[in-house]
Amino acid sequence: MKNIAIVYWSGTGNTEAMANAIAEGVREAGGTAALMGPSEFTSDSFRNYAAVAFGCPAMGAEELEDLEFGPMFDAVEPQLSGKNIALFGSYGWGDGEWMRSWCQRCAAANLFQPEGLILNETPDEEGLALCRELGAGLANW
């Protein structure tokens, strides 16, 4: 049974809904999912998980949230090399530029989905199904 961390920040609840669906997919596939906020994850946490899904919505001019999530991610970024990770988040406008930039930052890691998983606004059932698929994929990776 693989232990998967799902580390996310959500301002409106959309990215939180994605995180919960990813956790559901992990559990349905027989894994263990640990949901946590950015203040609960450090670079030392990597050793406890087979994979980590990081989730953050697009903020401002298509950037990561910069008060909680951004500083945490900046701190763990040097340890990403060779780690199994996935990226996900929601957005309200634009075309996903923040996710493309974020994926490029993570080039040294083993990205489960090289393009990340993005959903526009509140996830619908189709979007939640994609999140569950991501969770199952992480549990079986």
Q: Where on the chain are the PLM-derived regions?
A:
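Aromatic-flanked redox-active Cys/Sec active sites in thiol-based oxidoreductases
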Residues: Y8-T12
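Helix-turn-helix
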Residues: F41
